[in-house]
Amino acid sequence: MAEHAPHCTDLQKKILHHECPEHGLEYFLYDETVLAVLLRTAYKNNDIKFFTPSTFSQQLGYMNRPTGYDIPPHDHNPVSRNVEWTQETLFIRSGRVRLDLYAPGTRNHLGSCELLPGDVVLLAHGGHGFHMLEPSEMIEVKQGPYAGDMDKTRFVPQDGPLARSNAHE
């Protein structure tokens, strides 16, 4: 297992934090389940690369194309998809944000990671929460339409940073 990035703390032995050979790509796994895929602003590749398996209801990819490269005009065909779990992707536009990850089922705190401007994180499984370390802007993308209270269950963690403070939204 690779060394933890300096801005990922308290990962302990409960979560596998794996940095891929491509600098700037991090996977967070728990019991072989992908909790999150973090694409740091430093990530570079000379082609197109997708980081999520085809079983995910959201796909996270990266494209690096030269000047003059064309992506032919296209539209998308209707395809029936069954979405059981909401997966969301956050783009950090400004500020510093602490991401807290929680185990699927038990909701035990597994670790925290600092997100910086330009970082993109896909949250696939388990619980998560955020704490703004400074004024921050985030852009969120997830499946719609939003199902209101049916879409998420809020919880007060028994351990971790938010167990000792009041959770907001």
At which residue positions do the language-model features occur?
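Short beta-strand His + acidic residue motifs that chelate non-heme Fe in jelly-roll/DSBH
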Residues: 73, 99-100, 121-123, 127-133, ...
